[in-house]
Amino acid sequence: MRAVVLDTEPRTLRVVSDWPEPEPGPGEVLVRVRGVGICGSDLALHAGRRQPPSFPWVVGHETFGEIAATGPGVERGRTGQHVVVEPNIPCGTCPACRAGRTSACPHRKVLGFSVPGTLAEKIAVPAAYAWPVPDDWADGDAVCAEPLTVAHAAIRRAMAVKAAAPAGLERCLVIGAGSQGTLTCVALVACGIAPAVLDPQPGRLALAAELGGRVAEPGEGGFGLVFETSGAPEALAEATGRAARGGLIVLMGLNAQPVPVVTQRIVQRQLTLMGSLIYDHPGDFAAVTGERNRGAGRVLRACYPMAEAETAFSAAAAVPGKTWIRVQPPEGS
């Protein structure tokens, strides 16, 4: 079967036609992949800022398709279902998993990063991680389901923290209007919150405004809730400077570099900083796939065929909005 693999020298993507086709094992389903989204973590792998376990390496993790076959122990009636794939697979037995915090599982497998990814014609995944998608979801909404779930989880966690002191929730700021930032806007608007948005790229700000956000004013502060989605080194200082007294800052973006922090500002304003990583199984995916269509596909701005994966990855960072790859059309089209 065809698959897109990452090579090491040079660090480029290529399509191979003879990648082994998987067979669904016990408790697994075989998914015929229709599309895969590109996110910042994928771009870091492509650029060499992250390392896969081996080369050549199948990339991709934001995935939708349809179930082509079922393994032993899975209802045969699931064949033909349109699904989105939950790519983070926890062990289910460690203390974090038993406490319901599967996002903190130290043993979780991550499609595209610790195990081979999804940018292939077919993949085998545990049946519990292939979520049926409502009939009214277009392909664009389905390909955005995974990062939308990341946003949903961050908002859910923030609301749990702010439940004791809900004041200021109507004043919300999203820092970073990349694909994760814009999808966080979509999720907030669905909750009845119109966030202010901060980003250096005018095209990204225009997209955020189309989605129901607004451009943050220069120097504007007093935000009771701040979502930092960019991971930019300077973003933490921006967040602490714009947060209201007693405000909550949710860190979603990843940054591996040391950053200067003025703790006096955090202490005097009595700010709360919280990290939010991916989502918890099964609740967050169940919530997002079980809800009405939020129109997440509106963040999409570019689509490439599988044969142009290298071009798609090379261009994605400069696109205001999200880029995805069409692997194959729906069955029968």
State where each predicted segment sits.
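N-terminal glycine-rich cofactor-binding segment
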Residues: 5-23, 40-69, 84, 102-116
